[in-house]
């Protein structure tokens, strides 16, 4: 990799660290090409990205970003998973790490908050933004459904009373 490519990569990573909602740092030693491809495709489906990084370049890219504190995590064969959704990248990374012991979550950052491996796991357990939006829409729709049920109830009661009168008249 020549100087221009390194400079371009540092600029790209700086943009990632400055703008990502969350960054997860992990060791990937021992993963096969197929496993890495599988992980990347899972990340893409979730709206996240997974990138193998050179430690020195990643540390340079961290300068001037809110995530400068995670520089110590970049030692050994490291990769980053990142996304705008604060739950997407951690969720996919933790699920993959459960299936494959060779992906070791080291920690990460969410904004200026440094996360250890345990915090990344807790973040992965939270519902995603889409799931939260669906729950909110459901909560908003529930009162409307109940109101419709209450409004329809008197009509149903009237029909049952009339049916009882008709049945009583036939029996007599």
From Swiss-Prot:
GO terms for molecular function: large ribosomal subunit rRNA binding; structural constituent of ribosome. It comes from the Bacteria. GO terms for biological process: translation. GO terms for cellular component: large ribosomal subunit. PANTHER family: 39S RIBOSOMAL PROTEIN L10, MITOCHONDRIAL. Belongs to the universal ribosomal protein uL10 family. SUPFAM superfamilies: Ribosomal protein L10-like (SSF160369). Part of the ribosomal stalk of the 50S ribosomal subunit. The N-terminus interacts with L11 and the large rRNA to form the base of the stalk. The C-terminus forms an elongated spine to which L12 dimers bind in a sequential fashion forming a multimeric L10(L12)X complex. Forms part of the ribosomal stalk, playing a central role in the interaction of the ribosome with GTP-bound translation factors. Keywords: Ribonucleoprotein, Ribosomal protein, RNA-binding, rRNA-binding. This is Large ribosomal subunit protein uL10. The gene is rplJ. InterPro entries: Ribosomal_uL10, Ribosomal_uL10-like_sf, Ribosomal_uL10_bac, Ribosomal_uL10_bac_type, Ribosomal_uL10_CS_bac. Pfam families: Ribosomal_L10.
């Amino acid at each position: 990799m020549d100087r221009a490519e390194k400079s371009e990569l540092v600029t790209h990573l700086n943009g990632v660290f400055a703008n990502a909602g969350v960054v997860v740092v992990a060791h990937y030693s021992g993963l096969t090409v197929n496993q890495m491809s599988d992980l990347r495709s899972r990340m893409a489906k979730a709206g996240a990205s997974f990138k193998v990084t050179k430690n020195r370049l990643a540390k340079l890219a961290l300068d001037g970003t809110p995530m400068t504190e995670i520089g110590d995590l970049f030692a050994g064969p490291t990769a980053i998973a990142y996304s705008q959704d604060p739950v997407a990248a951690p969720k996919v990374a933790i699920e993959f790490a459960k299936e494959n012991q060779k992906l070791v979550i080291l920690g990460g950052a969410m904004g200026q908050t440094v996360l250890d491996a345990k915090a990344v796991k807790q973040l992965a357990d939270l519902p995603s933004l889409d799931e939260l939006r669906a729950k909110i829409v459901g909560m908003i729709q529930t009162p409307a459904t109940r109101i419709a049920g209450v409004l329809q109830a008197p009509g149903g009661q009237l029909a049952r009373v009339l049916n009882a009168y008709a049945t009583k008249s036939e029996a007599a």
